[in-house]
Amino acid sequence: MTVPTFLRKVTLREICVIEEYVDVQYRAIEALMDTLPSTDLVRLTVANALVSYQLSSSGEDWWREFSSYFRERRPRDIVREYARFLPRSRGNRRLIRQKLRRLHRAKAFLEELSWQDAKSYYRDMNRLRLDLARVLNADPESKTIVFTVKMFGYALRAITGRFRPYPFEIPIPVDARIERITRRITNDDPQLYWDSIARRTGIPPLHLDSILWVGTSRDPEVKRLLAKVLPKLIGELEMLGN
């Protein structure tokens, strides 16, 4: 299996820089650090990630809206305030009842999540994946479960200033963009394909997701920042995303 050319030109450290300086999701979480206590920021990040599917806006605009809303508030009850925000949002208006039910199922987990728990999960993010899947009665490899672990990792990295690579056993979250990119390369199952590429490049799947997500974004701000941070990949990534 051939490794895509652009992945031969990028290191995990460079992807980490892209995540922190280009990815709207990371920057949206980071922007809440001055507003919310650390534990509340982690809880809120997990809550938002768990219902970030079937969006009615781009993913970039959705995370901007989420961050903007909570920068203006200091909620005492994170889950209750999030349940108020979601139905009124612009970027996440589909399947609201289903998403509120999911939030309700996660309510006890979120409310009981302490800062010590969060630090422990950061040392073993695969355990977080399995616990979330159990709480929600979901497939541990499903898109929203693995995506939530990724966003949790972003929150802990932003808060602690410490980078921990994602575990190799956590697969890439397969959304429409990843599905489309994969089909331009191979007919293999996307998670199996990117797992194989991860092993060959030494870059965990959730970090591969970052370069694919950011690199094929049509968001003007993302494209501008990526051109500034890692110009050597712009051409190849744009071809992959078109």
UniProtKB/Swiss-Prot annotation:
Residues at which 8-oxoguanine binds: Q25, S52, W63, F147, P173, D209, W213
Pfam families registered for this protein in UniProt: AGOG
Catalytic activity: 2'-deoxyribonucleotide-(2'-deoxyribose 5'-phosphate)-2'-deoxyribonucleotide-DNA = a 3'-end 2'-deoxyribonucleotide-(2,3-dehydro-2,3-deoxyribose 5'-phosphate)-DNA + a 5'-end 5'-phospho-2'-deoxyribonucleoside-DNA + H(+)
Top-rank taxon, per record: Archaea
GO molecular function term, any single one: oxidized base lesion DNA N-glycosylase activity
BP GO annotations: base-excision repair
Location of the active site: K143 (schiff-base intermediate with dna), D175
UniProt keyword annotation of Hydrolase present: yes
Written domain comment of the UniProt record: Contains two alpha-helical subdomains, with the 8-oxoguanine binding site located in a cleft at their interface. Contains a helix-hairpin-helix (HhH) structural motif and a Gly/Pro-rich sequence followed by a conserved Asp (HhH-GPD motif).
Function statement: DNA repair enzyme that is part of the base excision repair (BER) pathway; protects from oxidative damage by removing the major product of DNA oxidation, 8-oxoguanine (GO), from single- and double-stranded DNA substrates.
NCBIfam families linked to this entry: PRK13280.1-2
Name under which the protein is recorded: N-glycosylase/DNA lyase
